[in-house]
Amino acid sequence: MPDLNHIIERMRANADAITALARDLSDAQSRWKPTADAWSLLEVVNHLHDEEREDFRTRVDYVLHRPGEQAPPIDPEGWVSARAYNQRDPRASLDAFLRERAASLEWLRGLHDPDWDAEYRAPWGVLRAGDLLVAWLAHDHLHVRQLNELHYAYLAQQAAPYSVEYAGEW
């Protein structure tokens, strides 16, 4: 059984980390992509917002409280271009994510004796509420890493002709 209080605290701390990595950047850095098919910092933040609102919280709710019902379909990869993430305002995007994260934390705190073993039968297999909960936190960690990688790559590109190699291997 997942320790809900620990997960809530880590999700709160990750919101702080995401804020530190996404706030007060130049517009150029917010929208910069290391390659044409990579995501920018701004796209990551908007992805986190939509995943918070339309994926994880929604799916945990469906598994716990609406057995047998199908959650609305999602298209996280497609949303990046369809919803023009990289054209949005960086500050407003971060603030929107933080509002959704606060709503998620409040919602999670309000759960009373959730059945983390409740199952959803997806076309690819069984998914439990607990699987979704821990994946939600893991998803944060993946994108905190991605935001750090984007900062590193941006610095390396902007620093030319100087090199970041002395810092150590990435």
Model-inferred region functions:
Residues 3, 41, 82-89, 124-128:
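Short amphipathic alpha-helical segments at helix-loop
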Residues 1-29, 51-62:
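Alpha-helical bundle segments that constitute or directly flank the non-heme di-iron/ferroxidase center
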Residues 2, 6-9, 32-33, 65, ...:
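Solvent-exposed interaction patches of small proteins and small membrane subunits
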Residues 12, 16, 50, 54, ...:
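Generic structural signal for well-ordered, non-transmembrane alpha-helical segments
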Residues 23-30, 109-117, 153-156:
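Surface-exposed helix-capping loop/turn segments at secondary-structure junctions
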Residues 31-76, 119-170:
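Short, contiguous alpha-helical
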Residues 14, 78-117, 131-136, 146:
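Acidic/histidine-rich alpha-helical segments that form the ligand environment
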